[in-house]
Amino acid sequence: MKQLEKITPLEKDFAQWYTDVVTNGNLMNYGPAKGTIIYKPNSYGIWENIQKTLNEVFKKHGVENIYAPLFIPESLFKIEKEHVQGFNPELATVTQVGNKKLSEKLIVRPTSEVIFANLFKEDINSYNDLPKIYNQWANVVRWEKVTKPFLRTREFLWQEGHTSHSSAEEARSFTVKMIKEYEKFLKNYLAIPVVSGKKTCNEKFAGAVSTYTVEAMMKDGKALQTGTSHYLGQKFSRPYGISFKNKNNEEDFVYQTSWGVSTRLLGAIIMVHGDNRGVIIPPKIAPIKVDILEILADKNPEVSKVANKIYKELSKKLSVRLDASNKSPGFKASQSEIEGVPLRIEVGPRDLENNCVTFVRRDTLEKTKVDLENVKKEVNNYLKLIQNNLYQAAKQRLEENTVYAYNYEDFKKHIVDNKFVVVPFCCVTKKEIEIKEETGATPRCILKKVKPRGVKLECVCKSDGCCDDDKAIKYVVFARAY
């Protein structure tokens, strides 16, 4: 069990626990350039399954996949000024090739609204060309000052959807539709419950009219933004000239959306489900769903025969891994656990004498004897149980650690305790900044529907004369965040 000894208990030091899990769980290595990582098979396998699943979801909404260039001419990028200001501190630029300086700087893609705006301008002329609904799977570069594997790296992977519509209503509807799809995907596949809502003006995407978000609670109580969907309105179409003739033969500008999730989801899986033995990967998204371990096969040749038979049967429909190495049983078990494989089947001489094998759940570490004739059926049952248990545990943790604040003093105490704090708030940017400076908390989202706990709440900042009662109409979730 030496591998497990390399992991710092999460209760002792959550940040170090996270680092230990990602470096020991076949998830990543640090790249040679500072702030970059190498995605190893265990993490990239999850990402491949995310791609496969979301592509199926997207197709139901008429989404077509394309690929756009990595480089953006600086003059094109600068047209939408709010967008430029939002990304300017993180921009990487190409200024020289070989010994020759470029006549114009090239921006290395931090996001692709600009490229898609240029594409839409060329391809859209009439309402008959609409809607355009595109997605791309790509890498992006943002020069983060402080980096953390999967959560903030200078290069990361994501999908970004971009659409153009003939009306604001259609675009707004699509924006909401996609955030709901992300919420369902996180629940059904990643076993992660979320809080969803609209971003405040200060927190919305640079260049958006409005931003919708899904926010997950990590085991340390901090929030992680796990997906966003932006209604761009005509904020890009007007400056970039994306116009079309509508049904009345009048010139109009398209209404746009953009939406995406990234490899931050890998960090979310680790910090929502992981324990002191490593990552726990939900079965529906796991690259390896079942590990089959041969135990003391050198003492009984029947072990290998049975293990191979189980492997051949299960691998017809599931991703299964067979460990027939001569490593010790303890090493094999700890390797499976630290990599987060949802279920392992131990095939050993003693169990075979009783015509059974041992199932070990990764989520609870519970061991169960299963008759050989029932292995196939029970594997499917166990994977469903594990998936559901992971979600229910995360949901319970979210509910138990989401609280209401009745005044600013209570609010500060709850933030210190790393809670999600729901407060009535006027969404004044100045006050958001003050709260962040004092407590480290930021508004994660404005809730659409809230059931107050029977007490009339005043705006959390009313005590210092910041706002009037009638402005305190929004309920906002605050939390410290990654």
From Swiss-Prot:
S-S bridge residues: none
Catalysed reactions, as listed in the record: tRNA(Pro) + L-proline + ATP = L-prolyl-tRNA(Pro) + AMP + diphosphate
GO CC annotations, alphabetized: aminoacyl-tRNA synthetase multienzyme complex; cytoplasm
GO BP, one annotated term: prolyl-tRNA aminoacylation
Keyword Nucleotide-binding: yes
InterPro entries to which the protein is assigned, alphabetical: aa-tRNA-synt_IIb (IPR002314), aa-tRNA-synth_II (IPR006195), aa-tRNA-synth_II/BPL/LPL (IPR045864), Anticodon-bd (IPR004154), Anticodon-bd_dom_sf (IPR036621), Pro-tRNA-ligase_IIa (IPR002316), Pro-tRNA-ligase_IIa_arc-type (IPR004499), Pro-tRNA_ligase_II_C (IPR016061)
Assigned keywords, A-Z: Aminoacyl-tRNA synthetase, ATP-binding, Cytoplasm, Ligase, Nucleotide-binding, Protein biosynthesis
Known EC number: 6.1.1.15
A Pfam family annotated for this UniProt entry: tRNA-synt_2b
Single GO molecular function: proline-tRNA ligase activity
Keyword DNA-binding: no
UniProt-annotated location(s): Cytoplasm
Quaternary structure, from the entry: Homodimer.
Stated family: Belongs to the class-II aminoacyl-tRNA synthetase family. ProS type 3 subfamily.
Function (record text): Catalyzes the attachment of proline to tRNA(Pro) in a two-step reaction: proline is first activated by ATP to form Pro-AMP and then transferred to the acceptor end of tRNA(Pro).
Comment block on domains: Consists of three domains: the N-terminal catalytic domain, the anticodon-binding domain and the C-terminal extension.
Protein name (record): Proline--tRNA ligase
Source organism: Mycoplasmopsis synoviae (strain 53) (Mycoplasma synoviae)
Gene: proS
